[in-house]
A protein has these predicted regions:
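Nucleotide-activated chemistry modules centered on ATP-dependent adenylation/adenylyltransferase
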Residues: 1-51, 87-111, 117-480
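A phosphate-binding catalytic loop at a beta-strand-loop-alpha-helix junction
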Residues: 46-80, 285
Length: 480
């Protein structure tokens, strides 16, 4: 790059910074100064900042967009006072919940912040097979991600847990995320620091949780148990393999490096900078990078909203199936309780919960919500309400002990065939093609997975013997 071009790009980036700072409130400007100082101290001063690499994980939500805007402002602020600044690695972890729409939002944010073509920014798309530079001109990056394996894990977990939302939707996602994070760290140059926007105690709780589960699963104590966050991530990767082995699913080829566990990444916690006293929902900075939006307009693809609404949806469907209630009764009860539990909490997720409770407070609005959530689950996992209802009844585990009750309640016309269906679950040669197709249709699972469930037991959350039960038993957030 010529000296003239460098000067021109420096001018452009300072114009970007000037425009971005115009959206910062006074408290946000103070928070930005604190963030800059924190990064400089972690790097060892201005003289070392040019060789310092900071990584942030982007999961598609507004918290991530807000954090990214601050980091970009910090990066450009340092560039304005010294010839060099830190390298910012933005890792987009490609999981099914990062939909085409979410990816398009990330692209909008990157355009507004001028991160494309900036040599001090590494924008990565990370999936199970590869890590690649994210380019706005590569359309494949924004195609829908296939999720057959993901759907199978979620539905099997749903059957084993009788549809407990956190055990059904969250644990498989958590375990698989560890490998994506490690791939993002191992790509290219060494990562010096990870940005963490959650409360300071969060990573400690995460590390302790994963280590407790690993011990429960029989992993012998070694160096990984005595160190910090990076070691916990490596244990989490092992648990992801355990989870797939347990469900008798194929374990992807391990493409990760074999670096030693003592290469801990520095954690730069920015919770007090970005989350403590700032009302993110009304921030002009967020409006700028995200575009105009309104939380009252349903945005189920917002991660914090999706977690709440999926749990509410499961409670609504469970009430219909097992108690004879109308759908809106269970949903409204869940949202009302969640809003009350978060009444005095002003963190972003709590703000979202309270706004959701206020927005979906009539049967008509909740029925519209149901259609949106059903569409969302179908887009993410190819999961229908029929599949979810089947998981809630869990009719195939414990050698199909609940099959008769399930058929009597949901498919009385199929009661005559229960013995044939049971045989289809027991052995391949005894199954008719029609029975197999029907079982796969109502469950969303291949018959091979249904036969695995046939030989498994429902999760006893108090005993902690299975992997799901161990995750639940030690989960610090299972009641949140």
């Amino acid at each position: 790059m010529s000296n003239f071009h460098e000067q021109a790009m420096h001018f452009v980036y300072q114009q970007v910074l000037h425009r971005l700072l115009g959206f910062f409130s006074r408290p946000e400007r103070i928070a930005l100064q604190l963030l800059v100082q924190r990064i400089l101290v972690a790097a060892g001063g201005l003289e070392r900042i040019g060789s310092y690499r900071v990584m942030v994980v982007h999961e598609g939500g507004k918290e991530c967009a807000y954090t990214l805007a601050f980091l970009r402002a910090a990066q450009l602020s340092i560039a304005g006072r010294t010839p060099e600044t830190f390298t910012l690695r933005i890792a987009v972890l490609r999981q099914p919940r990062v939909t085409t729409k979410v990816m398009a939002r990330i692209q909008t944010q990157c355009n507004e912040l001028f991160v494309y073509d900036d040599p001090t920014v590494e924008l990565l798309l990370v999936d199970e097979t590869q890590v690649r530079r994210l380019d706005k001109h590569i359309p494949v990056a924004f195609e829908r991600l296939g999720s057959d394996m993901d759907r199978t894990q979620i539905l099997m977990a749903g059957h084993l847990s009788e549809g407990v939302p956190r055990a059904t939707f969250f644990y498989a996602d958590l375990l698989s995320r560890a490998k994506l994070y490690r791939r993002a760290c191992e790509w290219g140059g060494h990562v010096d620091a990870l940005i963490d926007r959650r409360p300071p105690e969060h990573l400690g709780e995460y590390s302790q949780w994963i280590k407790q589960v690993a011990l429960k699963q029989g992993h012998a104590p070694n160096a990984l148990f005595t160190q910090g966050f990076e070691s916990a991530v490596k244990l989490c990767s092992k648990l992801d393999d355990d989870f797939k082995h347990w469900l008798r699913l194929p374990v992807p080829l391990n493409l990760l490096g074999t670096t030693s566990a003592d290469t801990e990444i520095n954690i730069i916690n920015v919770f007090d900078c970005l989350s403590y006293e700032v009302d993110m929902l009304h921030s002009q900075v967020l409006m700028f990078v995200e575009g105009s939006w309104n939380i009252k307009i349903l945005d189920i693809e917002e991660p914090q909203a999706a977690v709440v609404l999926l749990s509410a949806h499961v409670q609504g469907v469970r009430g219909v199936c097992q108690c004879g209630d109308e759908y809106h009764v269970g949903v409204q009860e869940f949202l009302r309780k969640a809003s009350a539990d978060n009444q005095t909490n002003e963190r972003y997720k709590s703000q979202v919960i309270k706004q959701l409770g206020g927005s979906f407070n009539t049967p008509r609005r909740i029925e519209k919500l149901r259609h949106s959530i059903t569409h969302y689950l179908d887009e993410l996992h190819g999961m229908t309400d029929e599949h979810l209802v089947c998981a809630l009844y869990s009719p195939f585990v414990d050698q199909a002990s609940g099959l008769e009750a399930f058929l009597r309640q949901r498919y009385p016309a199929k009661l005559y065939a229960q013995n044939d269906l049971r045989l289809a679950l027991m052995e391949e040669n005894a199954a008719s093609e029609a029975d197999v197709k029907w079982l796969e249709s109502i469950s969303g699972l291949p018959v091979s997975s249904l036969r695995v469930l046939f030989g498994m037991s429902k999760t006893d959350f108090t005993a902690g013997k299975s992997l799901i039960a161990a995750l639940w038993m030690h989960d610090p957030n299972k009641l949140l």
